[in-house]
Amino acid sequence: MDWQNPWQDATELSSKFAISHLAEEVGEVEKPRFAARPAYLYKQGLTPAEKGSAMHTYMQFCSYPAAARDADAELERLMADRFLTEEQGAAIETDRIRTFFESPLYRRIAGARQVWREYRFLAVIGEEELAGLADAGLGENRTTVQGVADCIFEEEDGIVIVDYKTDRVFSEDALRERYRVQLGLYGRLIGRALGRPVKECLLYSFALGRTIEVPF
């Protein structure tokens, strides 16, 4: 999701921006050269961004139980039902999908009390949250933010937020730092929206095949 008017005049009552990819806009870390290109998705035809979008579309519309049983068959269904084009389907390496569905993270999702996918939220934040975003040039007024979390699930002792990432990275620390601000805001604002405590914010890296906890 792209920024929407991130540098509104400070005299305005409020500004509005999207949280997704906040780290890239703020410039928290220097990205490795070509880091935005998910190398394992590279195939002739689609751009790297389109291939990453195809992976997210799979994760958005697939049946989790069906994908866990047979990721390739579920890909065929998504193409047959026109959630994905043939070109998009060809860009997805289902071994990456299988790694996710064989992970301890998926076992937690499968056993959760409740699961939300593509959870969209809108919130107004004030000085407390804005204080941590001073370098983003957002000013000091009330700011409306919008975002979407790929997956949220509820366990007995709280809410867990999961964001899927296709970035090409070489270490967990690089990915964790890149999305630290984004996930921190997700943790605070989604907990407020649901009225339940958020206990963990997690990234799942398809490039690394790992779950990465992000403190918030």
Give names to the regions the model predicted.
Residues M1-F216:
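Structural signature of nuclease core domains in nucleic-acid processing machines
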